[in-house]
């Protein structure tokens, strides 16, 4: 069964394994916002660059009470390498399964030769508000489409400062 997430809908309550040995839910009734970045995996150089650029803005996100969270289908060892090589301090989830990918409405790809030996999600970005609702959704079917980081940061700030409503709900 295919799923489509909708603006303003509740984020699917998926439990994610983290590289630090803990688990996390995409919504846990905290007062924090969550910026969830779905990346293709360690094999993707564009993902590496994008993650690094977001991580360089981690303090800005923290100032906006927004937790940065990366997830992929990579196994633990590859997710750890991704985090270590990029010096990521954010939460890093791994082992995203096909059911979780579908619940998030992600595009899923078969690997090409010399990539990986498992299916993986294409990139996505979700801004989850403190009520667990999807405030911003960007889902891509290819690695070449990524929202501009500075625009996302300005958007989060504008949403929070102006109580800007969730758009695209009709």
Sequence positions of predicted segments:
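Chalcogenol-based redox active-site neighborhoods
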Residues: 1-170
């Amino acid at each position: 069964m295919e799923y489509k997430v909708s603006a303003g809908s509740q984020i699917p309550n998926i439990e994610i394994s983290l590289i630090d040995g803990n688990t996390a839910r995409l919504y846990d009734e905290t007062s924090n916002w969550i910026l969830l970045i779905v990346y293709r995996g360690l094999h993707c150089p564009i993902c590496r660059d994008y993650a690094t650029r977001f991580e360089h803005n981690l303090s800005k996100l923290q100032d906006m009470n927004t937790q940065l969270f990366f997830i992929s289908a990579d196994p633990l060892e590859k997710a750890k390498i991704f985090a270590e090589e990029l010096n990521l301090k954010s939460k890093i989830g791994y082992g995203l399964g096909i059911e979780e990918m579908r619940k998030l409405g992600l595009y899923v790809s078969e690997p090409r030769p010399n990539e990986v030996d498992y299916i993986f999600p294409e990139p996505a970005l979700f801004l989850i508000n403190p009520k667990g609702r999807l405030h911003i959704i960007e889902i891509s079917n290819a690695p070449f489409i990524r929202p501009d980081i500075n625009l996302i940061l300005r958007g989060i700030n504008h949403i929070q400062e102006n109580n800007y409503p969730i758009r695209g709900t009709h």
